[in-house]
Amino acid sequence: MIKRYPTRKIKVGNVDVGGDAPISVQSMTYSKTKDIESTLDQINRLYFAGADIVRVAVLDEEDALALKEIKQKSPLPVIADIHFNYRLGLKAAEVVDGLRINPGNIGGKERVKAIVDACKARKIPIRIGVNAGSLEDHLENKYGQTPKAMVESALWHIKFLEDLDFFDIKVSLKASDVQRTVEAYRMLRPLVDYPFHLGVTEAGTKFHATIKSAAAFGALLLDGIGDTMRVSITGELEEEIKVGKAILKDLGLSKEGVNIISCPTCGRIEVDLPPIVEAVEEATKHIKKPLNLAVMGCVVNAIGEAKEADVAIACGKGYGLIIKKGEIIGKYKEEELLEKFLEEVKKESE
């Protein structure tokens, strides 16, 4: 069992982050926030995909003014992403559930203090978001875009807020590659007790982002590091949630949903297995109950693998077997096998 680092618990709307709270999965809309209809449409898509928290960009006054209606209609806690203009942070803090800022680019201490005071008044948290590509000049000149520079930046920003008597803090340390990201989080973890937001920034398209995020998050989460996370994908929003939840499930940190076991295929296979597995994935993606399903291309491996599965199919030429909890319950023609299998899955999911 993974032993998580003890961190202080904060609240983002109705979602606990840190402490003994489940690791939450979040994403960010890509619409112009001032386009309220499009932004809410994306938030609803994320909600139905299983997201826990959403972040929106606030670039100008119109974006800030749109936040009130978005927050009122959003099914998810809303975090506002603020850069450079502290006045936008003040307006956002009046209505949203949290801010993401870089204290170093907001302006002088008085401006940061104004934002902190606004967040204190509503008891909403601030995420300090450090990115390797946008470090302070003096740190980059001294260390380069290294984990050490990222950690020093985070510690400086944390102290900045602590000196203002503010402690509802989350921290992220993102680079665009796995090694620097993992090293930075590992370096900072023993030094503070604030919850960590995990992410690999600019991770790329679905394929590359999935690989990078699984590698980085897997390494960190197995070490007990991480309280909330975003898989950054250049692509559809729902994929970020799908991949994030799959990472948590495969690490044993989430019990929700279906786990599909399928063979990689070999010379024994006598059916076209990939379309069958894809059909099972599509038909079961809505199931919340934890179920192990096995889709095997021959009888040789199926009997053994099926012992671990709630429901399994062993596909053969012209026919196949359905197995429940290690017991064969039926033999069916190939053309009806998938339908019969899904009927048994539905029974188990109810």
Swiss-Prot record:
GO biological process: isopentenyl diphosphate biosynthetic process, methylerythritol 4-phosphate pathway; terpenoid biosynthetic process
Keywords for the protein's UniProt record, in alphabetical order: 4Fe-4S, Iron, Iron-sulfur, Isoprene biosynthesis, Metal-binding, Oxidoreductase
Cofactor comment text: Binds 1 [4Fe-4S] cluster.
Record GO terms (molecular function): 4 iron, 4 sulfur cluster binding; 4-hydroxy-3-methylbut-2-en-1-yl diphosphate synthase activity (ferredoxin); 4-hydroxy-3-methylbut-2-enyl-diphosphate synthase activity (flavodoxin); iron ion binding
InterPro entries registered for this protein in UniProt: Dihydropteroate_synth-like_sf, Enolase-like_C_sf, IspG_bac, IspG_bac-typ, NO2/SO3_Rdtase_4Fe4S_sf
Pathways per UniProt: Isoprenoid biosynthesis; isopentenyl diphosphate biosynthesis via DXP pathway; isopentenyl diphosphate from 1-deoxy-D-xylulose 5-phosphate: step 5/6
Catalytic activity: (2E)-4-hydroxy-3-methylbut-2-enyl diphosphate + oxidized [flavodoxin] + H2O + 2 H(+) = 2-C-methyl-D-erythritol 2,4-cyclic diphosphate + reduced [flavodoxin]
Lineage: superkingdom: Bacteria
Binding site for [4Fe-4S] cluster: 263, 266, 298, 305
Top EC class of this enzyme: oxidoreductase
Tagged with keyword 4Fe-4S: yes
Spans through the membrane: none
Entry's EC annotation: 1.17.7.3
Cofactor(s) the protein requires to work: [4Fe-4S] cluster
Family under the similarity heading: Belongs to the IspG family.
Task of the protein: Converts 2C-methyl-D-erythritol 2,4-cyclodiphosphate (ME-2,4cPP) into 1-hydroxy-2-methyl-2-(E)-butenyl 4-diphosphate.
Protein name, UniProt field: 4-hydroxy-3-methylbut-2-en-1-yl diphosphate synthase (flavodoxin)
Name of the gene encoding the protein in the UniProt record: ispG
